[in-house]
Amino acid sequence: MMAGRRPILVAATRQHVGKTTVSLSLMNGLKKRFDKLGFIKPVGQQHIEVQDDEGNPVRVDKDVELMKDYFGLDHLNFPDMSPVIIPRSYTKRFIDGEITAEHQYEQIRKAYDNVSSVSDQVLLEGTGHVGVGSGVNTSNAQVAALLGADVVLIANGGLGSAFDELDMNRAMCKEAGATIRGVIINKVQPDKLDMVRDYLGRLLEQRWGVPLLGVVPDLPFLS
C-alpha cells in the first residue's frame, strides 16, 4: 500500500526535547493526507505491559500504547509497533553474545514490513539522542539507515547551542549512512521565534542544504 514511500524517523539531539510531542503533531498532520498510518518505536527503553490481539501479555514501549490508542491504529499489532525493547542488563547480554545485531535487525525489518504492508505512510520514533543504542548496534542513526528512513531531527533552544547539538548528531547520522531531511526547533523563547526561524533556517540551508521545518515556542500549555 505504501507505493514506495520512505518512512520518516523522528530523532532528537538529546532526551526530553519534546520528541513524542512532535511525533504526535506529525502523526496528526499525516492523518490528513493518508487513510492509514503506521507507527513504530523500533527501539524502546521505557516499557509497559499490554495485551496483544489474542489477549496475551506483551511488553512495548510506553509511547506505542499512546499512539495506538490516540490515533486508533487498530490495523497494527503491538509487537510490530515495538520490536526491540532494551531492559536492564540488555547491553551485558549483547556483549556476552546472547543477543546479536543481526537478530535485532531481523526483528526491526520484520516489524517494518508488517506495518508498512497495511499502512500508507509509516512514522518511526527514535529513542533519546541519535546515538542512543550504539552499544548494542541499534542507534537511531543505524535504524534509520537500516530502513532507509528520512530523518527529522529535533533540538531545543536558540541559535548557536542548537546548531552545535544538531551538528554533533548529524555526524553520527553521516557515519551510519542515515540522511537528515529536515529540522524542527522546539521550546524556543517566544520573543526569539522570528530570529531563530530566520538565522537558523539560513544556516541549515547554507551548511547542510536542509530546511528548517518548524519552530515551536516554549509555552506552558504546550508542556
Task: Give the predicted meaning of each segment.
Residues 1-223:
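Flexible phosphate-sensing "switch/lid" loops adjacent to ATP/NTP-binding sites
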